[in-house]
Every structure is written in C-alpha cells, then in structure tokens.
C-alpha cells in the first residue's frame, strides 16, 4: 500500500471535487489556488471556458499594501475582498466555491469568509 504525499492528496481531492463542481454564466465558479507563499482566486465560467475576474497576492493593488512580515491569513482576507469587489463590479453576485482540493481551513477559509462579507453569495 503506497502512501501519497500531501500534494498528491490535494490533487486527488481536487479531481474528486471537480467531477461535481462547474460554473455557469449565471453562477460561475470561484476557484482558489494556494501555494506556499501566495494565494490566487479566479471567478470562472466553465461553460464558456473563460476567467471573468481574478485576484491574487501578486496584484499591483495588493502588493503595496501587504508587507512581507504580514500574516498570510490577512493577505487571504485582502484577496477575498478584492475578488468579491471585482466580481460584483461585473454583476456577479452568486458563485460556486471551489476550494481546489485544499481543506476548508486557515487561508482558504479566510478568503471565503472575506468574499462572503464583501457581498458574494455561496
């Protein structure tokens, strides 16, 4: 019996999730990708295979406000607020949350809570 690495476990969970999650034009998918140092969020219309809006810790809007010594959860909150603001500006109010195989905890949960507080419904 082989053991999977943590990254392989995440990829396996993501494949399992994606079988059931898809975004439409009415209710696109809010996909979250978490790396060791950054977090990315995209609002995706899977039917048209297009990204409607996105935000990450590498955005010019956030890079200046986030400090290198700041908390990664604080950065996730800022990304969640920014992606929600951009989605609402495009008229998107409801999304399907795709945690990307990550556990709903920590940075992923902070991003989701911030997006909800900023006005996205999921």
From Swiss-Prot:
InterPro entries, alphabetized: Ribosomal_uL18_bac-type, Ribosomal_uL18_bac/euk
Entry keyword set: Ribonucleoprotein, Ribosomal protein, RNA-binding, rRNA-binding
UniProt GO MF annotations: 5S rRNA binding; structural constituent of ribosome
Disordered: annotated span: 1-24
GO cellular component terms given for this protein: cytosolic large ribosomal subunit
GO biological process entries: translation
Family classification: Belongs to the universal ribosomal protein uL18 family.
Subunit structure: Part of the 50S ribosomal subunit; part of the 5S rRNA/L5/L18/L25 subcomplex. Contacts the 5S and 23S rRNAs.
Job description of the protein: This is one of the proteins that bind and probably mediate the attachment of the 5S RNA into the large ribosomal subunit, where it forms part of the central protuberance.
The name this protein goes by in its record: Large ribosomal subunit protein uL18
Organism this protein belongs to: Synechococcus sp. (strain WH7803)
Organism phylogeny: Bacteria, Bacillati, Cyanobacteriota, Cyanophyceae, Synechococcales
